[in-house]
Amino acid sequence: MITIPYLTAVSTYFSYGLLFAFGQLRDFFRRFIDWWFTSNLQGYAPICLGHEDFYIRRLYHRIQDCFERPISSAPDAWFDVVERYSNDNNKTLKRTTKTSRCLNLGSYNYLGFGSFDEYCTPRVIESLKKFSASTCSSRVDAGTTSVHAELEECVTRFVGKPAAVVFGMGYATNSAIIPVLIGKGGLIISDSLNHSSIVNGARGSGATIRVFQHNTPSHLERVLREQIAEGQPRTHRPWKKIIVVVEGIYSMEGEICHLPEVVAICKKYKAYVYLDEAHSIGAIGKTGKGICELLGVDTADVDVMMGTFTKSFGSCGGYIAGSKELIQYLKHQCPAHLYATSIPTPSAQQIISAIKVILGEDGSNRGAQKLARIRENSNFFRAELQKMGFEVLGDNDSPVMPIMLYNPAKIPAFSRECLRQKVAVVVVGFPATPLLLARARICISASHSREDLIRALKVISKVGDLSGIKYFPAEPKKIEQSKNDIKLD
């Protein structure tokens, strides 16, 4: 739970109030212009309504240049950011031919597989030559190749479940699978900060949805107990099925799930555990096998294991791992498997090769080195940010580090100044976060050198001073005692 300092909350509310007031004033004068110039869309219902339309026009457009920045190179430790300009107050942004070489603190390239790799890339190129860029078919038609079969076997072995099925899109893995697993008469109990794909999948299922306080097992147990006692709405019949949905690492918080407690509670109340490991698989654990390995949880106690290949593996798509009966059922029922084009074969080969590197099956210890480096880099960077006085969310070992900004004016200030000093960061505000909880989300990679991280820390510290986001006092710097100093008894 984030506790906002009182003065920070007041100043943030004041900033939003000021933006709202000026926006309303501009809209007032805009009515006269709209009246004078007739529109070709008279009689059409507006696409955006009310406050959503107002927010986009009067708040988001002001800082639109801080989002969706195009890049023109691989998402390595350093990449090329395309420069843009606007002639209409950020309503439209146009690309230039100029690029800026920036330190990449925004990509999910946790293990550094997002760029050229001496083991993965040649095999991906060979796969492209043999199978082409797309299968042009769904898995149940002509879209299953030998590479897809090998990938599912590889994932099964890596995550420690009896079977697995892969999909071409990580987001769709959640949003398409959950409605197949549960429907009307079922109960989904979801963490309050679960990803949008989980939220949309739960809403589309038709099941009753209840939310428990973020990463709070005691509240989860209370909700479970109450819902089991009450039963289904109106009829009070027992629930047909109960699924508890949590994430391994919460992408906007950088926090690691209290999985052992969640599993124990679900066992007690006979509820299924659905674990989303989008950000944790491959990135944490001694051998990269995710939160179960990190926290010592038996994978047999997690009923449905979901993950994506877009982060640690440098590819695309997602997977579901579980019992053989579950996977067979999903292959016959899930629309994402039946109707969507299968994951591109070169992308599947990239995942297989990355897993082999992580497991050391490439004949080297590069996988172990990458895992040690991402852990070392993450803990070093987090500790240094906290020493500087930033409010940093998340837990140790997590490569995701949100730095709290709060005030809406500090979103563009932090983003633009960092970019000006050749450090590319991701900033996040409403509606992706609550209104008062804007933040910058730092993602650390194994491809970052210690020199890269020190340079980034210097820039972020300087920008933090300029924008006033060091909400805690910095630790005093330790002065090393010179050998020539005279010690007085």
From Swiss-Prot:
One GO cellular component, as annotated: membrane
Expression (tissue specificity): Ubiquitous. Detected in leaves, roots, stems, flowers and at a lower level in mature seeds.
Claim: Cytoplasm is one of the keywords in the record: no
Cofactor(s) recorded in Swiss-Prot or TrEMBL: pyridoxal 5'-phosphate
A Pfam family this chain is assigned to: Aminotran_1_2
Disulfide partners: none
Reaction(s) the record says it catalyses: L-serine + hexadecanoyl-CoA + H(+) = 3-oxosphinganine + CO2 + CoA
Positions of transmembrane segments: 2-22
Subcellular location(s) per record: Endoplasmic reticulum membrane
UniProt topology in membrane: Single-pass membrane protein
EC number: 2.3.1.50
Principal EC category: transferase
GO molecular function: pyridoxal phosphate binding; serine C-palmitoyltransferase activity
Annotated pathway: Lipid metabolism; sphingolipid metabolism
Tagged with keyword Ligase: no
InterPro entries linked to this entry: Aminotrans_II_pyridoxalP_BS, Aminotransferase_I/II_large, AON_synthase_class-II, PyrdxlP-dep_Trfase, PyrdxlP-dep_Trfase_major, PyrdxlP-dep_Trfase_small
Disruption phenotype: No visible phenotype. Lcb2a and lcb2b double mutant is not viable due to pollen lethality.
An annotated GO BP: pollen development
Alphabetical keyword list: Acyltransferase, Apoptosis, Endoplasmic reticulum, Lipid metabolism, Membrane, Pyridoxal phosphate, Sphingolipid metabolism, Transferase, Transmembrane, Transmembrane helix
Family: Belongs to the class-II pyridoxal-phosphate-dependent aminotransferase family.
Functional summary from the UniProt entry: Serine palmitoyltransferase (SPT). The heterodimer formed with LCB1 constitutes the catalytic core. Involved in the regulation of the programmed cell death (PCD) signaling pathway. Plays an important role during male gametogenesis and embryogenesis.
Additional note from the record: The lcb2a-1 mutant is incapable of initiating programmed cell death (PCD) after induction by fumonisin B1 (FB1), a specific inhibitor of ceramide synthase.
Subunit structure, interactors included: Heterodimer with LCB1. Component of the serine palmitoyltransferase (SPT) complex, composed of LCB1 and LCB2 (LCB2a or LCB2b).
The name this protein goes by in its record: Long chain base biosynthesis protein 2a
Gene that encodes the chain: LCB2a
